[in-house]
Regions:
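Conserved active-site loop/cleft motifs that coordinate metal ions or position small ligands
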Residues: 178-180, 213-222
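Outer-membrane beta-barrel "beta-signal"
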Residues: 201, 212-213, 240-256
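Detector for outer-membrane/organellar transmembrane beta-barrel domains
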Residues: 28-188, 195-201, 205
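Short proline/glycine-enriched turn/loop segments at secondary-structure junctions
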Residues: 135-137, 191, 209-210, 238-243
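Tryptophan-centered motif/residue detector
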Residues: 157, 171, 226, 255-256
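Outer-membrane beta-barrel biogenesis signature
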Residues: 207-218, 229
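Outer membrane beta-barrel
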Residues: 1-41, 196-200, 221-226
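Low-complexity, intrinsically disordered Gly/Pro/Thr-rich segments
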Residues: 230-239
Length: 256
């Protein structure tokens, strides 16, 4: 169990910096059917107040932001040391001040405040698998489904579906061929409805025959295309008037 406080110095009221307080409780490594289980629960409160002109990014009005609260919870199922890898399935749901959770727990940032923060909602489900049946091949598929409603989505339900796969073939102890292909579809009523597809090929040098062996040095080539709805929204300035793109380069990846 933990108490976590987060504040935004760029947003102020007569009460000081806008702050959110969380009480977070978690229980992991529960042995059960088909593997290990975990659960978490978070309760969050944000004290509102009168925002002075310009204190809220993107707003020029004096706004009285109401105090809000909310809860979030999650359920995780894992199977470790499974076919040379692991399996993790996670479902999370949050409301109001606790709706901006990320990863396996609570959010550590405060979103732009609005009069409708109490109506914010988020549902997120992810399935992540790593398989390495031999020392010559490994593969990692992932699936994600999210529905979200908040200030950034104009209080409409935004839906995001994403899935992809990354195989890796080990040619020697230090040389391997890897890559990935993925697909995303995003829908926000009245704003956009579109998709993006991407594939990457990358020969790389690493320390061993393990999928997560690091550090690695890789050369990569990537091709992506996306629907016309996303023209100007994907790829930044170099691809702002296009619906496809190609890029390449060198990349070093290291963890600690």
């Amino acid at each position: 169990m933990a108490f976590i406080g987060v504040a935004r110095p760029d947003v102020t009221t007569q009460n000081g910096n806008l702050a959110t307080s969380h009480i977070d409780a978690r229980v992991y490594d529960i042995n059960g059917p088909l593997g290990s289980w975990g659960v978490w629960f978070d309760y969050a409160t944000t004290k509102g107040g009168q925002m002075t002109a310009g204190s809220v990014p993107g707003s020029s009005d004096v706004t009285n932001i109401p105090s809000t609260s909310g809860y979030a919870y999650g359920i995780r199922h894992q199977r470790l040391e499974w076919h040379g890898g692991y399996h993790t399935f996670l479902i999370q749901y949050g409301t109001g001040a606790a709706s901006n959770f990320s990863g396996p727990g609570i959010g550590t940032t405060i979103p732009t405040p609005s009069l409708d923060t109490a109506r914010s909602r988020q549902f997120l489900a992810t399935e992540q698998i790593v398989l390495q049946p031999t020392d010559k091949f490994a593969v990692m598929p992932i699936v994600l489904f999210q529905r979200m409603r908040n200030f950034n989505t104009q209080n409409q339900w935004q839906q995001w579906i994403s899935f992809g796969v990354r195989p890796q073939v080990f040619l020697t102890k230090h040389l391997s061929l890897t890559g990935d292909c993925g697909f995303d579809h995003t829908n926000l009523p009245g704003a956009y409805d579109g998709w993006l597809r991407k594939c990457t090929f990358a020969p790389q040098i690493g320390p061993d025959r393990k999928f997560f062996g690091r550090p690695v040095l890789r050369a990569f080539v990537t091709y992506a295309n996306w629907s016309r709805t996303f023209r100007g929204l994907v790829g930044g300035v170099p691809f702002q008037n296009q619906t496809s793109g190609f890029t390449y380069g060198l990349q070093v990846e290291h963890w600690w």
